[in-house]
Amino acid sequence: MPRRSIWKGSFVDAFLLRMKKKRDLLFNRKIWSRRSSILPEFVDCFVRIYNGKTFVRCKITEGKVGHKFGEFAFTRKRRPSRTNIGPGRKRGKK
């Protein structure tokens, strides 16, 4: 995926920029903007990121700075591969 131009800077929603100045408002805050970048001012805050159905709680650490909020709230369920079929079942059609 192409990266955003350096001269444009990282994208952050306007309401998150307002929260940047008041850190106490950001604790345990609901965030719908999955496309916004995580800024260094958000480190050590807990936020709840919307995944399309529920809000996923996430702690912002230094390693997450520069990434997008949506990278840490998965939108799809993980399903294990069905390699083992139980005894008594037959594979495929005859």
From Swiss-Prot:
Gene Ontology biological-process entries: ribosomal small subunit assembly; translation
Entry-linked PROSITE patterns: RIBOSOMAL_S19
Keyword Mitochondrion: yes
Record key words, sorted: Mitochondrion, Ribonucleoprotein, Ribosomal protein
A GO CC annotation given for this chain: mitochondrial small ribosomal subunit
MF term (GO), any: RNA binding
InterPro entries recorded: Ribosomal_uS19 (IPR002222), Ribosomal_uS19_bac-type (IPR005732), Ribosomal_uS19_CS (IPR020934), Ribosomal_uS19_SF (IPR023575)
Keyword DNA repair: no
One Pfam short name: Ribosomal_S19
Protein localization: Mitochondrion
HAMAP family per record: Ribosomal_uS19 (MF_00531)
PANTHER family on file: RIBOSOMAL PROTEIN S19P FAMILY MEMBER, SMALL RIBOSOMAL SUBUNIT PROTEIN US19M
Family affiliation: Belongs to the universal ribosomal protein uS19 family.
Protein name according to UniProt: Small ribosomal subunit protein uS19m
